[in-house]
Structures are given as structure tokens and as C-alpha cells.
Regions:
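Acetyl-CoA-dependent GNAT
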Residues: 3, 10-114, 122-134, 182-184, ...
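Conserved active-site alpha-helix within GNAT-family acetyltransferase domains
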Residues: 116, 120, 132, 145-175
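Conserved hydrophobic beta-strand within the GNAT/NAT acetyltransferase core sheet
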Residues: 104, 139-143
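Compact beta-sheet-dominated globular domain cores
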Residues: 191-193
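C-terminal interaction modules of eukaryotic adaptor/scaffold proteins
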Residues: 175-182
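Conserved SAM-binding loop
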Residues: 5, 115, 143
Length: 209
């Protein structure tokens, strides 16, 4: 089994939606994924697990029983979407802030593939692309106040800063932290790898920059 990160395409949107439905309470229709990918194709990425055996079992043995024929996380029989980042550029002509900036709409990694550094690498790829392709000066996002793992990633690993608390931001009434990161392209390279699998991901990320 191997894991790689590549730019998301229209062919990935059903698998991306499935990864979203499995992991997050904030869900979107397929047309919303399509809107992002068609409008800002450089800003969204997927993490792919490949090397699936002919019997449908993932050779990486992450504790999953897999069936490519019946599992919508598969793009094809050899590629399983295990995570994604959905990004966009803010383009509201009536907004007071005219500075070009991006927004992370959604980030998700399947539970059995967490703690491999995949979420951080997806984020770095998207942030780099927004900076390089769209000249984004900063990126914003929202995160649930209760989501400690995401807060650790954004605040401690990626150095986002909390700019405000938005009351009852989510449909269930939970507050959100509004966060922001000023983009510096030289700071968006992969972090030091902890093990062989992370090292492969870092190499893949560098090759896509």
C-alpha cells in the first residue's frame, strides 16, 4: 500500500462527499464540491490510498474491510480516497476586504488513516497552491470550539491564529473559532517526517509543488 496526495478532480467528488459524511457533521451536496473544483481547481486536494489487492482488501491493512465495487470512497478499484481538503478563494465583490485571500471550506481524513500527518500535508498543499496560483495573502477557516484535534493542527502545527468567536455558527448551535493564517510561501513546505510513511508523503508533496 502507498499513500499519495494529488489535486482533486470532478471524478473524485463522490468519494470526497463520502469521506465527509463518514467523519463530519457539516455536509454538502455534490454540486458544492463541483463548484469548488471547477472554480478554483488548484485549491482542493485528495489523499489516495493505492495498492489495493484484487480481492478488494487494502494491502496496507489499516483495519478496514474494503470492497471497491460497493464502496463510494473508491475512485477506481486501485484508488481509495482517504482524505481531502476543499479550498476556495473568497470572491465577494461587496466585501470590505479586497485583499486576495482563501478559505478552507472542509478538511477530512478517514479515522483509520489519522495520526499519519495526512491532514497537515493536505492543508499545506492547498495553502501553497492558493499562495502560488492565486496570490492569496492569507487564508481563513472556521472550526468547532470542541474540536481539539483540529485546533491542535491549525493553531499549533500550522500556526493559524484565532481572530474571533462566532456564536452559534453551526446548525446545532455550537460556537466556532474563526481562524486566520498570513501566508508566507517559504513556510509552507512539509514538516520533518516522523516515520517512513510520512516521509513518502512529504516527498509526494514536494513533487507536486
Amino acid at each position: 500500500m502507498g499513500i499519495s496526495i494529488r489535486q482533486a478532480t470532478i471524478n473524485d467528488i463522490q468519494a470526497m462527499q463520502n469521506a465527509n459524511l463518514h467523519n463530519l457533521p457539516e455536509n454538502y451536496q455534490l454540486k458544492y464540491y463541483m463548484y469548488h473544483i471547477l472554480s478554483w481547481p488548484q485549491a482542493s486536494y485528495v489523499a489516495i490510498s493505492y495498492g489495493v489487492q484484487e480481492n478488494g482488501e487494502d494491502s496496507g491493512n489499516h483495519g478496514e474491510i474494503t470492497d471497491p465495487k460497493g464502496d463510494s470512497t473508491y475512485v477506481n478499484k486501485n484508488e481509495k480516497v482517504i482524505g481531502y481538503v476543499l479550498g476556495k478563494m473568497e470572491d465577494d465583490p461587496e466585501a470590505e476586504d479586497k485583499t486576495p485571500h482563501g478559505h478552507i471550506t472542509s478538511l477530512s481524513v478517514m479515522r483509520s488513516y489519522r495520526r499519519l500527518g495526512i491532514a497537515e500535508k493536505l492543508m499545506r498543499q492547498s495553502l501553497y497552491a492558493m499562495c502560488e496560483s492565486f496570490d492569496a495573502k492569507y487564508v481563513s477557516l472556521h472550526v468547532r470550539k470542541s474540536n481539539r484535534a483540529a485546533l491542535h493542527l491549525y493553531r499549533d502545527s500550522l500556526k493559524f491564529e484565532v481572530t474571533s468567536i462566532e456564536k452559534s455558527y453551526y446548525q446545532d448551535g455550537e460556537d466556532a473559532y474563526a481562524m486566520r493564517l498570513d501566508l508566507k510561501i517559504e513556510e509552507l513546505l512539509p514538516s520533518t517526517a516522523q516515520d517512513g510513511e510520512e516521509d513518502d508523503l512529504s516527498k509526494d508533496l514536494l513533487e507536486n509543488l
